[in-house]
Amino acid sequence: MAEREVEIVIPPHAPGLQHHFADLEQQREASTMGMWVFLITEVMFFGGMFFAYLVYRRMYYQAWVAGSEAMDFWYGTVNTVILICSSLTMALAVRASQLGRRRALVILLIVTMIFGLGFMTVKGVEYHGHWLKHEFPGPSFHFEGPYEQQVQIFFSLYWAMTGFHTLHVLIGIIIIGFVAYFGWRGDYTPANHNTVENVGLYWHFVDTVWIYLYPLLYLISHSHPFK
């Protein structure tokens, strides 16, 4: 008796589905979990610098006030407004990807990139001003006023925290550029837009870090709760 051949039917491969996932839902859950784990490590990274800042602020409060007075309030405020606006455009971009509105997605991502570049431009002008005044930690550091050594610690943390944050903004701009290209190409659909959501999470995290940096660095001289 001849054996009957069994026909194996392979389900069609969903667009955007990587081979090691069973379906798009499993892929979405895995990538979202991976992004949150990454963001937790970022929280610990910046959290260490925030902790050091608060410890030294408690030890040298008057020096911290003096250092904050050397900050340009308007540069910090303008950059805060820029990043808040960029969070809005990113949120709208995520929504556009969920609705399958490719044109809106690309436009909103490009606008978000422009906001990011605007932030970096303002930050570059601010950095240049500090550099000209020798407010950079090292042998040539100079600060007109008391507590020069302690203020140098303030500026060390200022450059470290804002420098790493600006680096994260730059990385975000580059990633958003790639996502905008893939969105223009039509890679994202209402069923497969998790990449846009994850990039949105990253960008909102970067913006949130700045929301903490802004009062710590620019507003301390205007409010003295720990006197």
PLM features: residue spans?
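...captures the hydrophobic TM-helix bundle architecture rather than a specific catalytic motif
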Residues: 1-227
